């Protein structure tokens, strides 16, 4: 007897993979996640970017039973900064070099991968590692920005490229590391590169066709040319001199965005000036709009509704690109639609997101560059001499910031914001008339001098901050900075990975340590959570990296700071186990010889190293472990130093040629500095030995 057709069709549907039946992601689906926590469809989970999940199967009472459900080894040796997305049983995430993978969330099986084949030498003009912070979903497509400035749409089922747009001028040192967002059918993407002399902008592309819809420049260009949009005419009045457009200006939109569908406002954060030192890029002062600002933009047209400048006339790399979070807070007995940000400069800002008016701003950590933010003017009250015009200064925070890109989260239940706080001093020196723009790290702020910051004064913490009272609720200290982002849940939990290689769960209300997992790799990314077949999971990309690990220094050489790249997925009663890590290779210590060159030659090498080499090989020649430590380079490497640096002998391995920027005598000075540092450190170790 044949089965009724109706029954046969039902069985066919049940047997069909969910991905094949999946409804496309749209605005309604993303907005629905505000109440339903099963899926994670956008970078910060919802348009508000709260990184809070209403899921509570895993809670403070049972999180001790959390275990590894499965893991996936990744062919990745650089930093993993992405927050995975989850839709209809599939995890979508990105790795270094802008590669994308889709993974079956139940089994951990790879479904497809896409490699945009970014040239490895592109890392030379990417300030902060070959990282990527994630992808976007819309309709039946996955979107990724690439390190070389492309925006690519992929088929969500197959990973095949559908369209690709070069969003930047490939002849200029732009890069993309941030995750795209999709708003009203438009893919929003920014870029980075201010340290190398670019002009910032944010663009919107049609999600279906890839056609450019609009572009908003964050700083003015050549005043002899027409302004691209009227906002730039007003911005130009806040710049001085006749060089700023030649130096790039900066203001890149390299990370944070949020969207309010009811107000129909897209919020984006802008970055630092190019170069950092205002005295060089805009002699005579000025606020330099729209650097270090929060912009509210109409997503249909790209028109500016309002702006708030976090750090006027920035001279310290105090970006406003840190996470923007939207919420409703009860302030003075009234509900307010607010925007919250804890940017690099160390003040926690609460703004009225309808008009950009400042509600409150207080220090959330050690801040010496400014006394306070004047609520009447919305401007910081700067400390004397903080702009280092006359003499070098040491101040807090540093260019790493009191909070960097590592995601914070807001829990509406506790009313607290969970911030990956870091305390690192900055050293700044005015290079002034001696500054020369080169194809290198152009700060004009004495970047090489930051090598003198000792590890003993560096620390980090998980900070629970009350945005209404503007004070800390609790704090968990860590031995160093550059810890991962946070996730908070309705289960009264906060999850965070650390630089030292642990994944933690704390109670969201009190900060009590409830659970810990040894991840075998430093973690910089933020966790996410999803539900599949009635079971809640927590996932994180574990892979040590990012700018702090490249610039290195003593504080980036703690135990656990390794890169063993994996996608880790946890659930209650998970039974999977990581294999034991391979033992570290034995180090053979060389007995170096003292450098007999003139001190001025070594000092010149130090300045050149700071500008050209430190961003990859580590400040003070102390590598963070991802890129070779030049103090330990072999005799053969030293012998062929000129060929490597100028002729590109190691270009296939990602070491670019600097023949367009350095002279042979300068390369020799760099080598002398490296050798002198090797000798200094060797003598210091043996002098300290018992």
Curated annotation (Swiss-Prot):
Gene3D superfamilies: Cytochrome c-like domain, Quinoprotein alcohol dehydrogenase-like superfamily. The active site is at 317 (proton acceptor). Its EC number is 1.1.9.1. Induction: By 1-butanol. Primary and secondary C3,C4 alcohols as well as butyraldehyde. Keywords: Calcium, Disulfide bond, Heme, Iron, Metal-binding, Oxidoreductase, Periplasm, PQQ, Signal. It is found in: Periplasm. This is Quinohemoprotein alcohol dehydrogenase ADH IIB. It comes from Pseudomonas putida (Arthrobacter siderocapsulatus). The gene is qbdA.
